[in-house]
Design a protein with these regions (language model features):
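Positions in alpha-helical segments
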Residues: 16, 41-44, 257
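Key DNA-contact positions within bacterial/archaeal DNA-binding proteins
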Residues: 30, 40-41
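C-terminal regulatory/effector modules of DNA-binding transcriptional regulators
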Residues: 164, 171, 183-283
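N-terminal membrane-targeting segments
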Residues: 36, 44-45
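Short glycine/serine/threonine/alanine-rich loop segments
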Residues: 27, 38, 203
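Interdomain hinge/linker segments and adjacent boundary elements that couple functional modules
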Residues: 2-16, 20, 24, 29-34, ...
Length: 283
């Protein structure tokens, strides 16, 4: 077992899942450590992501905890063996860790679903739009800090442009479409970009019009990241102080249902493009 000062988001998730397995098996850390032939301190360090864990140890722990879901177990194994130093590591000294965790989880996701009520999806923002958003972050960032955030956001978008892009589905409230971030020129360019991206086969954009009134999750910005198996999905919520990550199965099920409802309420992709085009022409 090895240590590192800043565990990756995926290593943290593996640690969380191993703790969940132990708790479901009804074992204390003392009993589990004894059966594994290790100390309680070492097991606690594994479950808190301070120590890494080998594939063989993951399989042994899963077997000891009577976990028969081999797809899930092997997904955990792959999470420990995949390349851990992604492009986001270059930002570790200049951006909050939560933004790096989001980039890492997105990079390894199989699909992404999002819903936004007051701003454009980060994965579909233009550089000028993102720059204007980050200029209004509190506490006020310096110009270099703004550019670091813009660069990081644009690099996240490689998910959509790479050779094997993810499936991306987003619902954006009409309010976010109409807000003229950066003025008419920047806002119009953002809408044209949104239209262009919506034409891609693997990208679905839907607008939730003002006319729907109240809807589930209003006021929330939600990123739902699909993992290799449903148990390893992640729901991420935007908060003023930074991103919040959720992995409890009951919450994952709730946010999947919420997104289902919002998507079924929103305009079709075709009607969405018509509305975005009309709003763009009025700017």
């Amino acid at each position: 077992m090895t240590t590192r000062p800043a565990p990756s988001a995926r290593r943290t998730r593996v640690a969380t899942e191993l703790r969940k397995l132990r708790e479901r098996a009804g074992m204390t850390t003392t009993e589990a450590a004894r059966r594994l032939g290790t100390s309680t301190g070492q097991l606690s360090n594994v479950e808190s992501a301070r120590f890494g864990v080998s594939p063989d140890r993951i399989r042994a722990m899963a077997s000891m905890y009577c976990c028969a879901d081999q797809d899930y177990v092997e997904a955990l194994v792959r999470m420990t063996t995949a390349r851990s130093h992604g492009w986001w590591e270059a930002y570790r000294e200049v951006l909050p860790s939560g933004l790096l965790d989001l980039a890492e989880l997105e990079y390894h996701s199989t699909a992404v679903r999002t819903a936004y009520t007051t701003h454009m999806p980060g994965l579909l923002q233009t550089p000028d739009h993102a720059r204007e958003i980050f200029r209004h972050v509190l506490p006020a960032p310096t110009p270099p800090e703004v550019e670091h955030r813009v660069s990081h956001r644009i690099q996240r978008q490689d998910l959509i442009y790479r050779a094997q892009p993810i499936t991306y589905r987003t619902v954006v409230h009409e309010a976010a479409v109409r807000i003229q971030v950066g003025g008419p020129r920047v806002a119009r360019a953002q809408l044209q970009h949104l239209l262009a991206m919506s034409e891609r086969d693997h990208v679905t954009v839907q607008v939730l019009p003002f006319g729907v009134g109240a809807f589930p999750g209003s006021g929330q910005s939600i990123n739902y990241l699909h993992g290799p198996v449903p148990q390893l999905d992640t729901a991420q919520l935007d908060q003023f102080h930074g991103p919040v990550f959720l992995d409890a199965e009951a919450l994952l099920e709730m946010y999947r249902h919420l997104l289902d409802v919002v998507e079924s309420t929103a305009l079709s992709p075709e009607k969405t493009r018509d509305l975005i085009h009309a709003i763009s022409q009025d700017m």
